[in-house]
């Protein structure tokens, strides 16, 4: 996008369309903002920053992580990898159901005691103290060992990338092959029915946006109703994802085997050491 101080001639518009930096200095002086959607996608495809190429530096940001690195108006099909020719992948695909962060206010915090063991924990929420699928919820979280220090010989890596891929999926209600995949009539939980009515909680990477395009981005910064210890996924007759993995941690505790817990995200950000 380009924003000028005045109405421009057709030739000036065409020149700006070809690229701000290649314009004459006279034309560049008339431009208030020239936002380049491909300027910073090579190393950071999921960046939320939009770069203004003018001296005004009116840099912006995008909300809810729409798909970047999409084929632009000038795409030639000569290169299929966006970072090999980023100038041809300057489009952004916005969806009305994109979400990167629910941006809810903080209701409570928990200070982790120094002596608490590393493990998988959950905050239990209840309505009027009632215990049922409609009145109780568990918000899982991981307590890691102190940074840079292992407290056990065994480290359990929680596969949170897999959890995010299936987070809030609606295949049980939307997919025409749900029964074929499950090998039975899908049994839906209360949270499945709720998510079917409330798509504002975001989708899984197995879902489709409202415009029919596939979902490429999933986020943990929102309620993930099928990442709960008591949730039973429609795809499996028994357990799936987090509640299946909790059987491993339960077995380790039952056998009195000490272990630390970290997540895929920790491994990605901090490395093995």
Language-model features: locations:
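Short, structured interface segments
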Residues: 12-19, 137-143
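Extracellular glycan-recognition modules
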Residues: 3-13
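Flexible, glycine-rich phosphate/dinucleotide-binding loops
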Residues: 10, 41-43, 163, 268
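Short, surface-exposed loop/turn segments at beta-strand-coil junctions that are enriched for proline
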Residues: 111-115
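Aromatic-Pro/Gly-enriched surface loop or interdomain linker
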Residues: 65-100, 120, 127-272
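Short hydrophobic/aromatic patches on beta-strands that form ligand-binding or substrate-lining surfaces
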Residues: 1-4, 35
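Short strand-edge motifs at loop-to-beta-strand transitions and within beta-strands
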Residues: 106-110
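Extracytoplasmic low-complexity segments
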Residues: 14-88
